[in-house]
C-alpha cells in the first residue's frame, strides 16, 4: 500500500520535468529503472539496496576470520546496475550509501578496504564512474555492529532506439543467463537455515565449498551482455533481472503473457542444499530464489543464436530456456518439467 501511495504521489510531480526540457516517456513507471526523455536521448535513474547479505559476511568472518566484503561491494553495485540496464541504459555514475550505527565500524581496516575495493570493482565491471556517496552514522537507528548498504546510479540511452521498452510478442524466445549463486535475494531464509545447521555457515554443500562461501559468491553484473547486444543491433524486446520473487519475476511485464520454461537445468548445488536442509519445497524455492538464473532476455526466435553468441562473447553462460505465448488475459510462468505454475496474482511488484 505504501509503495502504491508513493507511486501515485510521484506521478503527480511529472509536470516539474518540463521546465528542464525533459518529459516522462510512456510505460516507465513501475519498471526497474525510471526514465526521463530528452530530444535525442533518455536518462535513467535507479535506487537499490543490498538487503541482508552483509549479515552473512559478518557471521562468516567471525567463524573463519576471512572477510567477504569485497564480494559485498560488488553485490551492492550489481543490484543497482542490473536494474538500471533493464531499460537499455548504460551506467554512467554510481553512488554508494553506507549507513552505520557507529563510526567504529570503519575501523576494521581489512573489512573497510575490502568493501571499497569491491565497490570500485563493481563499477569497473559496469563501465561506470564511482561518483561519490554518503556514509552517515545513525546512532539508535542502525545497529552499531552492522552497515546498511545501498546506492543509486544514473545511466543514458543513446541512440533512443536502444531503449528496451517491453514490446514482448507471442512466440518470443526466452534466454537465460546464469547467476553466480543466490546473488542478493532470499538471504533472510538462508540465514534462518544456517541457524538450524550444527556447523552453521561452515557446513559443506557438497561441491567443495561451505554454505557460507557459496552464499557469499559475488553477483554477476549483466551490463556487458546488454551493451554487446546493442553493439550488434540485436533487438531485446524485454529483459528481467531475476532477483526477489524468484522465477515469478519472469512475468514482471505488465501486459499479460504466459511464459513457458521448457529447458530447465539442474539447480546448482547451493540451491539443492537449501531445499534439502531447509527443507524448502520446490514451489517455494523457485518462487524465492533465482535457482541459477540471474537474468532473462526475450527476443524474436530468429535472433536466438545471435543473442547466445553475444552472451558467450561477453563472458556469460546462457541458454535457450523457453518461449512466450498470448493466452488472453492470463499471466503466468509455467515450468512443465517441474510441475510448477505461478499465476499472475502471485507477483505484486507494481
What is the predicted function of each stretch?
Residues 160-211:
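Short, acidic (Asp/Glu-rich) active-site segment that either coordinates a divalent metal cofactor
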Residues 66-74, 211-220:
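Active-site pocket-shaping loop/turn-to-helix segments
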Residues 108-126, 142-147, 208-214, 220-350:
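Glycine-/charge-enriched secondary-structure boundary and capping motifs
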Residues 53-63, 202-210, 255-258:
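Gly-rich Lys/Arg/Thr-decorated short loops/hinges at beta-loop-alpha junctions or inter-strand turns
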Residues 6-180, 341:
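Glycine-rich phosphate/pyrophosphate-binding loop regions near the starts of catalytic domains
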Residues 41-43, 49-51, 199-201, 264-275:
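Acidic-glycine-rich active-site phosphate/pyrophosphate-binding loop
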Amino acid at each position: 500500500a505504501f509503495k502504491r501511495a508513493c507511486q501515485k504521489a510521484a506521478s503527480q510531480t511529472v509536470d516539474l520535468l518540463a521546465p528542464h526540457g525533459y518529459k516522462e516517456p510512456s510505460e516507465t513507471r513501475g519498471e526497474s529503472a525510471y526514465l526521463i526523455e530528452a530530444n535525442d536521448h533518455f536518462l535513467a535513474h535507479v535506487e537499490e539496496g543490498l538487503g541482508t547479505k552483509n549479515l552473512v559476511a559478518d557471521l562468516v568472518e567471525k567463524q573463519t576470520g576471512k572477510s567477504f566484503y569485497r564480494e559485498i561491494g560488488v553485490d551492492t553495485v550489481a543490484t543497482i546496475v542490473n536494474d538500471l540496464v533493464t531499460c537499455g541504459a548504460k551506467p554512467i555514475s554510481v553512488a554508494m550509501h553506507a549507513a552505520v550505527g557507529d563510526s567504529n565500524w570503519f575501523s576494521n581496516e581489512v573489512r573497510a578496504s575490502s568493501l571499497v575495493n569491491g565497490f570500485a570493482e563493481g563499477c569497473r565491471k559496469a563501465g561506470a564512474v564511482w561518483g561519490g556517496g554518503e556514509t552517515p552514522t545513525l546512532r539508535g537507528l542502525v545497529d552499531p555492529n552492522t552497515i546498511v548498504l545501498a546506492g543509486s546510479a544514473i545511466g543514458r540511452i543513446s541512440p533512443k532506439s536502444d531503449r528496451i521498452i517491453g514490446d514482448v510478442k507471442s512466440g518470443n524466445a526466452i534466454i537465460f543467463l546464469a547467476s553466480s549463486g543466490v546473488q542478493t535475494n532470499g538471504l533472510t531464509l538462508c540465514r534462518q537455515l544456517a541457524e538450524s545447521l550444527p556447523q552453521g555457515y561452515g557446513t559443506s554443500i557438497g561441491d567443495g565449498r561451505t554454505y557460507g562461501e557459496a552464499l557469499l559468491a559475488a553477483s554477476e553484473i549483466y551490463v556487458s551482455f546488454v551493451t554487446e547486444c546493442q553493439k550488434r543491433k540485436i533487438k531485446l524486446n524485454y529483459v528481467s533481472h531475476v532477483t526477489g520473487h524468484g522465477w515469478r519475476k519472469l512475468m514482471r511485464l505488465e501486459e499479460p503473457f504466459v511464459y513457458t520454461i521448457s529447458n530447465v537445468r539442474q539447480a546448482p548445488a547451493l540451491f539443492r542444499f537449501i531445499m534439502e536442509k531447509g527443507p524448502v519445497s520446490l514451489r517455494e524455492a523457485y518462487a524465492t530464489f533465482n535457482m541459477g538464473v540471474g537474468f532473462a532476455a526475450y527476443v524474436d526466435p530468429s535472433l536466438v543464436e545471435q543473442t547466445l553468441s553475444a552472451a558467450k562473447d561477453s563472458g556469460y553462460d546462457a541458454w535457450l530456456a523457453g518461449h512466450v505465448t498470448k493466452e488472453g488475459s492470463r499471466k503466468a510462468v509455467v515450468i512443465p518439467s517441474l510441475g510448477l505454475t505461478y499465476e499472475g496474482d502471485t507477483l505484486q511488484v507494481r
